[in-house]
Amino acid sequence: MRGHQIVPEFGKRVTDVLKSMLRPALLPAPGKSFIVYDWSSIEARVTPWLSMDGDDTLQVFREGRDIYVAVAARMFNLAEADVTDEQRQLGKVAVLACGFAGGVGAFAAMGRVYGVHLPEHEAKRTVDLWRKANPWAVPFWSDLEQSYTRAIRNPGEVFTAGRVQYMKQGDHLWYALPSGRVLCYPYARFEEDGVSYAKASW
């Protein structure tokens, strides 16, 4: 089948279409089953843990509380019992959009998924409230940026940010996770607008 036959005229990139076709293409052996699952609130768990400075957020999970209510309560300076459904939804969108250094654009995109539509100035205010309620976030993002920048400039040396490490070897930037897995950013280099690396869409 040719690419133009599977990609609608005004649709997605070929790589996005192929990615969405991967799971349906996998078939279990006879008598076996695949189990598909999703980590609960993984976005809210992983970045504070990686930062080594997000214990307040992680404590919400330890106590079995609703993370989106807890975040909204911190954002709007309320008791958790006083958080409305609308405020919880804002907290949810903020958690999903902002944890990986997302800003107003990420908030707006995630808001569309969950039916939250705010004017730009309100979206910015909400992002700012999330960042203030999660003091581990901005310093961790800064540490990550400094670490990968220094790694690119100093090949062969290891630089740490929270629980992760960066090292440039040859043309590639390597990102070591606490699990022992290593991600590769091929041909990482500096460009005028920041760091660039080879992506599947190239």
Q: What feature does the model see in each segment?
A:
Residues 1-202:
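Conserved catalytic core of nucleotide polymerization and phosphodiester-bond processing enzymes
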